[in-house]
From Swiss-Prot:
Its main location: cytoplasm. The keyword Ligase applies. This is Proline--tRNA ligase. Homodimer. SUPFAM superfamilies: Class II aaRS ABD-related (SSF52954), Class II aaRS and biotin synthetases (SSF55681), YbaK/ProRS associated domain (SSF55826). Consists of three domains: the N-terminal catalytic domain, the editing domain and the C-terminal anticodon-binding domain. One of its GO terms (cellular component) is cytosol. Keywords: Aminoacyl-tRNA synthetase, ATP-binding, Cytoplasm, Ligase, Nucleotide-binding, Protein biosynthesis.
Length: 571
């Protein structure tokens, strides 16, 4: 491709409304342009990258044995009513009425459509397992679209759905998809983690997120320093090790009129925060226990996902208000604790190992110091209640935990029978009777992968693509003052044609521009391999090679340039 014939569309300045690096660089590199809130045109440079990511996803999915289909973006409301998600999904589901006064939606996902399709096409257990996928545009009417294509309203997604007659069969396909996703993100050259995840509202028995590590990520990712253990912070197990020490002091009731928070208590009484506990009151799951106390160490944070899964706690999790707490306990939020507590309590594992700790006395303006389990208060139920912190021991016993920010680019679920049951999707089983199909679903945000890659791989000059396979162009030819030097022009043209003949994805900057402008544009869009052709070097039979990723520069003989690139490209 010649730049003189190409829509490069680069910008020198960063648009004011672009908050994250990927949005800034995608606009500056001429990859996307906004059309409306959360809607973007993909320009040639952006589309080249998007299509290359899409092709990698497609190739690996096909290798896994999945079969590609394509389903409509527009879906009839009847399917959503049948699955009972018509009312549940909320305002993100864009609904409209056609000229025949029939309700439709723009598909944010395709569980309903694929379940209906397979129900109609598959009648026997002999036709299963089946794994169907598509790469297609989705639409979710986000209340606050932001960060460019990272969280837009329209996006490109690969969604796959598998159908089975047994949980064992589902697990086999799930394992295949887990490996396939690892292959995809490894091939993309990304630093990522496959993490155990909460199944959330989708439900199911197992779930993994694939997270690209980046400082701008919205999720906290926990992983071991010495093993493959990784989990979303919502699911990461907090291990407590060691033994509870014997009491060393007598429990004491202390006036603390100005200590409304843990920080107040620590500062005013010169306490160690690790020797304090905080008590949080939530709604109970049973009428006979309307309130439950959850107790964590003063320097730890309650993990609400873990708390919500406790059988004693109401789902969804709801914190009690000040009036409810005062009515039941007789003290305000800043003065609560396990001693003489009139409601059931559940304590975190780390709290169970504490001795001589400080806690609210359930009397406003008072705290107990030097409290000990079994001596001053009975040990309540113990559970994993907290978020892990950096340096905690890994649950698998190998190394310590690290925490980094991540961008979710893929998610796989074992759905079970949630949709097939609701939509009566059955096949004839081996025994001749109808059997409800068991489902799995597997998604990759293809357009989000592009943004996540840029978030992870960039510098002050622009984008550094993590893999040659997804760069908009693999090689750039940058001729210095080509229109003033016949030798430069002739060699540049010959090299360009040779690379085209070898099917190398090459961009030839044949513009009448200053070298500084040419370098800035090529480095901004992230072309990994640059061949710089200058008059002085050519006179010596040489050209200059520059690597965008490493910054390496090398002078090579012009006769060797094709062999040199053959060894470097996609290496």
């Amino acid at each position: 491709m010649r730049t003189s014939k190409y829509l490069l569309s680069t910008l020198k300045e960063t648009p004011n409304d672009a908050q994250v690096v990927s949005h800034q660089l995608m606009l500056r590199a001429g990859m996307i342009r906004p059309l409306a809130s959360g809607l973007y045109n993909w320009l040639p440079t952006g589309l080249r990258v998007l299509k290359k990511v899409e092709n990698i996803v497609r190739e690996e999915m096909n290798k896994s044995g999945a079969i590609e289909v394509e389903m409509p973006v527009v879906q009839p409301a009847e399917l959503w009513q049948e699955s009972q998600r018509w009312e549940q999904y909320g305002p993100e589901l864009l609904r409209f009425v056609d000229r025949g006064n029939r309700d439709f939606v723009l598909g944010p996902t395709h569980e309903e459509v694929i379940t209906d399709l397979v129900h109609r096409e598959v009648s026997s257990y002999k036709q299963l397992p089946l794994n169907l996928y598509q790469i297609q545009t989705k639409f979710r009417d986000e209340v606050r679209p932001r960060f460019g294509v990272m969280r837009g309203r329209e996006f490109l997604m690969k969604d796959a759905y598998s159908f089975h007659t047994s949980k064992e069969c589902l697990q086999n396909t799930y394992d295949v998809m887990y490996r396939t996703y690892n292959n995809i993100f490894t091939r993309l050259g990304l630093d990522f983690r496959a993490v155990q995840a909460d199944t959330g509202s989708i439900g199911g028995s197992a779930s993994h997120e694939f997270q690209v590590l980046a400082k701008s990520g919205e999720d906290d990712i926990v992983f071991s320093s010495n093993s493959d253990y990784a989990a979303n912070i919502e699911l990461a197990e907090a291990v407590a090790i060691g033994q509870r020490q014997a009491p060393s002091a007598t429990m004491e009731l202390v006036d603390t009129p100005n200590a409304k928070t843990i920080n107040d208590l620590v500062e005013q009484f010169n306490l160690s925060v690790e020797k304090t506990v905080k008590t949080l009151i939530v709604k109970g799951a049973n009428e006979d226990q309307p309130l439950i106390a959850l107790i964590v160490r003063g320097d730890h944070e309650l993990n609400e996902v873990k708390a919500q899964k406790l059988p004693e706690v109401a789902d969804p999790l709801e914190f009690a208000n000040e009036d409810e707490i005062k009515t039941k306990i007789g003290a305000g939020i800043g003065s609560l604790g396990p001693v003489n507590l009139p409601i059931p309590a559940i304590i975190d594992r780390s709290v169970a190992l504490m001795s001589d700790f400080s806690t609210g006395a359930n009397i406003d303006g008072k705290h107990y110091f030097n409290v000990n389990w079994d001596r001053d208060v009975a040990l309540p139920k113990v559970a994993d209640l907290r978020n892990v912190v950096e340096g905690d021991p890994s649950p698998d016993g190998k190394g310590t935990l690290q925490i980094k920010r991540g961008i979710e680019v893929g998610h796989i679920f074992q759905l079970g029978t949630k949709y097939s049951e609701a939509m009566k999707a059955t096949v004839q089983g081996e025994d001749g009777r109808p059997q409800t199909m068991i489902m799995g679903c597997y998604g990759i945000g293809v357009s989000r992968v592009v943004a996540a890659t840029i978030e992870q791989c960039h510098d002050e000059k622009g984008i550094i693509w993590s893999s040659d396979e997804i760069a908009p162009f693999t090689v750039a030819i940058i001729p210095m003052n080509m229109y003033k030097s016949k030798n430069v022009q002739i060699f540049a043209e010959e090299l360009y044609q040779s690379l085209l003949n070898k099917n190398v994805d090459v961009i030839f900057d044949d513009r009448k521009e200053r070298p500084g402008v040419m370098f800035a544009d090529i480095e901004l869009i992230g072309v990994p391999h640059m061949i710089v052709i200058g008059e002085k070097n050519l006179e010596k039979g040489e050209i200059e090679y520059k690597n965008r990723r490493t910054g390496e520069k090398q002078i090579i003989a012009k006769e060797q340039v094709l062999d040199f690139l053959a060894q470097r490209v996609n290496a």
